[in-house]
């Protein structure tokens, strides 16, 4: 279990809720929706399209056979870790009006989130920034909304001291900007006019083609 997923479960348990897990070693979307019906689950935690696509396929199959799953108890689906595409979010919302919470972060710190509903249509890789988060260009400029530049996302607040016995990686990731200590896990983004960001992906996974940078989220969105 990841630290982030553990935090979600701990929060529910501390509030008097119940944490429900699957006994299956693999992921079975039909089994998940059956369990949601049986237990009247309110919150579902997933990891992007890797889970959401088969979940949507299962809902579509059930609807096509006039045996739709009962989703009336579901209030929110929470995702983090990999891309959750606009197409799949819209598909889920057709079956049930709920909140789709897409969170962006890493072990080094939380950065942003987005919430989609039928009245607030989703956008792929669009996030509102958490307080204390900046986007900084490679030349050190702190970007403002509407900038044409692309920058690294940095988060302040509860920033780790460093990586154990890895001074080089620690110096690359944890830096001070104007006297404030930030964590820069390596994610690039563009800061839009409205103050939201479009996440482009991890710089270490970027592909250079004919002088242009192609980011992971751009490739995944096309696929």
PLM features: what roles do these ranges have?
Residues 122-128, 173, 179-180:
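Short Gly/Pro-enriched turn/cap motifs at secondary-structure boundaries
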Residues 44, 105, 156, 161-162, ...:
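AMP-binding/adenylate-forming catalytic core of the ANL superfamily
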Residues 3, 53, 109, 151, ...:
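Glycine-centered loop/turn positions within well-structured domains
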Residues 3-45, 54, 58-63:
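Conserved AMP-binding/adenylation subdomain of ANL enzymes
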Residues 134-155, 173, 190-194:
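Conserved beta-loop-beta connector loops within the AMP-binding
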Residues 1-5, 220-223:
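Short, intrinsically disordered, charge-balanced linker/junction segments flanking boundaries
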Residues 6, 22, 47-48, 79-80, ...:
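Short hydrophobic "strand-cap" motifs at the C-terminus of beta-strands
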Residues 14-17, 41-46, 56-122, 128, ...:
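Gly/Ser/Thr-rich phosphate-binding loop
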